[in-house]
């Protein structure tokens, strides 16, 4: 690849395309966990580990593409807002491919959409809770490192506030200052369908 941006854009696009292919190949399914391997030692094994795809002359599964290639090869938490595992709690799939020349702006936009969507970040003043996507729990260290790289602070909530749109940005900071409890939502593994983003 001529640049790191080219390699990252290619890898994100490959992940999303392979997920779509895997769902289409297994259709009809209700959830990605419905795809089974010969053995199923844990939920999602068939979809994320057992299916192998030929990519760049080698066999790879979705788990390794996400964790070894994307997370291991690039220190950029915005990846979590760009890759989509075809599940209800995933970020929204971009209608456009990620391109090297516009990658930084595309990743910022994906992260802004993710952090500003009430399905992924919701401040509930009635219960004094901040409900976050499980993605922020699973990959908390990635988001904390992203906040530090951006000079935005050191926490997951700092990363969220940094990327959120103007309408949403103040809510997590205000809620944290008020001592609200952070809770992580259960992950919806059902195959994603169009959402009413007011949820």
Model-derived regions: residue spans:
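Interaction/scaffold regions that mediate signaling and macromolecular assembly across diverse proteins
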Residues: 1-199
């Amino acid at each position: 690849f001529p640049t790191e941006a080219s390699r990252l854009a290619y890898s994100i696009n490959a992940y999303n395309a392979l997920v779509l292919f895997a769902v289409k190949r297994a259709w009809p399914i209700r959830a990605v966990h419905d795809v089974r391997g010969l053995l199923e030692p844990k939920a999602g094994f068939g979809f994320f580990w057992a299916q192998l795809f030929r990519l760049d002359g080698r066999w790879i599964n979705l788990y390794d593409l996400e964790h070894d290639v994307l997370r291991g090869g690039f220190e950029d938490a915005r990846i979590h807002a760009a890759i989509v595992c075809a599940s209800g709690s995933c970020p929204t799939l971009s209608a456009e491919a990620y391109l090297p020349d516009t990658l930084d702006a595309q990743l910022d936009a994906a992260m802004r959409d993710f952090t500003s969507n009430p399905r992924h970040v919701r401040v509930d003043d009635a219960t004094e809770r901040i409900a976050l996507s499980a993605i922020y729990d699973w990959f908390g260290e990635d988001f904390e490192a992203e906040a530090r790289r951006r000079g935005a602070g050191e926490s997951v909530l700092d990363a969220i506030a940094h990327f959120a749109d103007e309408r949403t940005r103040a809510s997590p900071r205000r809620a944290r200052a008020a001592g609200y409890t952070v809770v992580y939502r259960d992950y919806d593994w059902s195959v994603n369908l169009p959402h009413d983003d007011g949820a």
